[in-house]
Amino acid sequence: MSARKKNRIHVFFVSIMIIISLVSGFGEGIKQINYKDLIKDTIPGCTSKNPKECVKVPANTYHRGCEISTRCHREQHSSSG
């Protein structure tokens, strides 16, 4: 390859990289999270004076599903002694 052809290829790729960076918004700056936004994510009533309010209730409690060994039937406990 001649030096002139290599130079054109380099200019082409540099031009493409500049265009891509302008279109993608590279260098616009990153928004920072401030402390006020972090305060909004707290549980209402959860303070150092009232720590019992800070406990979260699980959304879905665990329950055991169907088991192959019991053929999906629940065991009945007999009260005969």
UniProtKB/Swiss-Prot annotation:
Signal peptide: 1-29
InterPro entries the record matches: RALF
Cellular component annotations (GO), alphabetically ordered: apoplast
Any single GO BP term: calcium-mediated signaling
Disulfide bridge positions per record: C46-C54, C66-C72
Keyword Kinase: no
Keyword Signal: yes
Bilayer-spanning residue ranges: none
GO molecular function: hormone activity
UniProt keywords, alphabetically: Disulfide bond, Hormone, Secreted, Signal
Major subcellular location class: secreted
Cell compartments where the protein resides: Secreted
Family label: Belongs to the plant rapid alkalinization factor (RALF) family.
Its biological purpose: Cell signaling peptide that may regulate plant stress, growth, and development. Mediates a rapid alkalinization of extracellular space by mediating a transient increase in the cytoplasmic Ca(2+) concentration leading to a calcium-dependent signaling events through a cell surface receptor and a concomitant activation of some intracellular mitogen-activated protein kinases.
Protein name stated in the entry: Protein RALF-like 7
This protein's encoding gene: RALFL7
